[in-house]
């Protein structure tokens, strides 16, 4: 399906390109002159990429079906129709993959691959028009009275996009609820999630002007509260979490000490409980506070959220960085990490006020060199969090095994801390960490220190291109290596987590299955 050139979304072979286990996606080598930057230049050249000379039309289903060849390929995404013909040779998934979208509504196909891709920006010069909506029988008699839609200057505003179908809700008793109360100087909102909350938290709060958006990330489900507040409040939100009882309390300070008669006006999707994958991404502007070298080509970024925002990123979830490169929005997911693997005894940072991201800089990339060159104090749009990992997979696990390659280590970092802090039933956790050279190992000294402090934790480093002085394991992942690593003691419950470049992940998953681990005992981290 529609994808983006490999340098930016993300770099070829990075762990962010991994599909679910068993659903590998073929990549093709792009011809010279067909990178993302080349595509951006083409869209800025003034060349007619739609074949309509700037006209925007309304497209019927029958008309869409006619455009189903490589040289004449239209597709519909969220109600908007695009001509993909010019993009064929720029698509890293290849022509065959892109042709799956030819002549049809490809929204679901697109969402299967990378729903976070900003196709509106990438394909804005390929916009043919809007999909004609078939009136329902009940409305048929009234169509003559409706005003025709003007298509000049057509874009894809959120109001035109069909709302995704929500998944069946869990039993009513499990649906979160909220309440609120006030004092002379504060307004307090209490959310009862009706489940235990992990130590990492689950609340994402954004106060922008008078609008308050509160999202609870509860496993695969998202609970959203959204108001235009009755009166002004100060631009700071206190978030307190009672983890064991599943309660989250927000405290807002009133700008004027007066009694509120109501909390505010409900906004779009207020008090909804749907699957996370069906919830649209919400972006906020963050400030780059610091960049720290982790290795020769990897940096740890610290981003500060706006004063009115708090983000508790659940373990295994990623956020999206968005910035403009030559006038085109470029977006890429990154797994949130902690500031360090071993937490300091005291920290001055307020929980949820900062985000830390570990980013490998690809010299030929589009986004990562741009980020690496940003000055301290620069702004970056951050969306999410999002991801499929839930703590349910850790239930009753006694042996946790992690197979990571390169920056595929990032989701493992917080998983290790979570397991050590919150899951005493886990008797053993082992990380096998694959890299090319010793200088590529992320947080090597911290991993070694953790091994000495925590008898439950063990790390084995494997290098494919080691120096002669290297005394550790050598080579690439294979069956013999895993057979000795993935022990299955009597009366144990095991979980194997995998993350890394696509080739590594596919090999690891295949080898783990050959060792008779079930699908329930295997989790692949993916974007």
Swiss-Prot record:
Residue ranges occupied by any Cytochrome b5 heme-binding domain in the UniProt entry: 56-132
Pfam families: Cyt-b5, FAD_binding_6, NAD_binding_1
Region spans: Disordered: 1-24, 138-171
Cofactor: FAD
Keyword annotations from UniProtKB, A to Z: Endoplasmic reticulum, FAD, Flavoprotein, Heme, Iron, Metal-binding, NAD, Oxidoreductase
Family: Belongs to the flavoprotein pyridine nucleotide cytochrome reductase family.
PANTHER family reported in the protein's UniProt record: CYTOCHROME B5 REDUCTASE 4, CYTOCHROME B5 REDUCTASE 4 FAMILY MEMBER
Protein name: Cytochrome b5 reductase 4
Organism (species): Danio rerio (Zebrafish)
